Amino acid sequence: MEALPGGIGVTHLIVYDTPGPDGLIGGSPHLHFACSEAYLVIKGQGSVQTLSSNGFREVALGAGSLVWFTPGLIHRLINQDGQLEIFALMENAGLPENGDSVLTFPIEHLADEDCYLQYASLERAGSASADSREAAKKRRDLAVEGFLSLRTELQQGGSLHRFYSQAVRLVQPKESTWRTLWQTGPASTIQRTKNFLDKLRTGASDYLNRGRVFEVPLDPAQEERRLGMCGTLRKYLPEGEIIASNAAPG
């Protein structure tokens, strides 16, 4: 089994096509703590609204757009024409699947993990999938309410400090699990590159004999889309299966 290049995760995302409490169609605003994320737009028109210590910003999205952002940036996808489809590329595969995100619920819903999960409709393991479209919509709407409050606070000269502090308290207990996942997964790909460079320094070529091709096999079970934070998801598992050679021995 082999990780995707750079230890990333890939997800096909069809952004929700229902309006939020402010009338804008789109997904649930949230942020990540240890992973950068990129959006490669393959269809439709929309935007990503963001909040950071620099305030509010909106970036237009269309087919071919590529945008990315670092941990701490609160982001909300807007599906302007109802057709927005994206490949989401997530750093550090394994961490997002194990809870590296917090939705922008109003601060009173971030009091503790039990309170947060109750309103987020998440599994205890930290899954980002809801169990029904109604649950996903309710969660999205609550996150939008919190997002709008944070935006107003920033516009009035406030900061994100209180929200950030409470969000970190929610995810801090997961740090040791995330560290283990990172050390045994994405970080190991960096060490492997170092090993390759060490080989090149000495002029060795033997490691090239281990080159192989991998794929994520088509599996009907994997084609069943899940309800995520921003839309319906089709995940591509980060570990691919080797494609067996059919060549006759020479």
Question: What name fits each language-model region?
Answer:
Residues 2-15:
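N-terminal regions that are enriched for targeting/export leaders
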Residues 124-208:
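An accessory alpha-helical subdomain
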Residues 181-250:
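C-terminal non-catalytic accessory extensions
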Residues 12-32:
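Conserved short histidine dyad/triad with adjacent acidic residue
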Residues 51-71:
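Short acidic-glycine-tyrosine-enriched beta hairpin
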Residues 33-48, 90-91:
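Short, conserved beta-strand element in jelly-roll/cupin
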Residues 81-157:
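Double-stranded beta-helix
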Residues 73-76:
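Short, charged beta-turn/beta-strand-edge "cap" motif at the junction between a beta-strand
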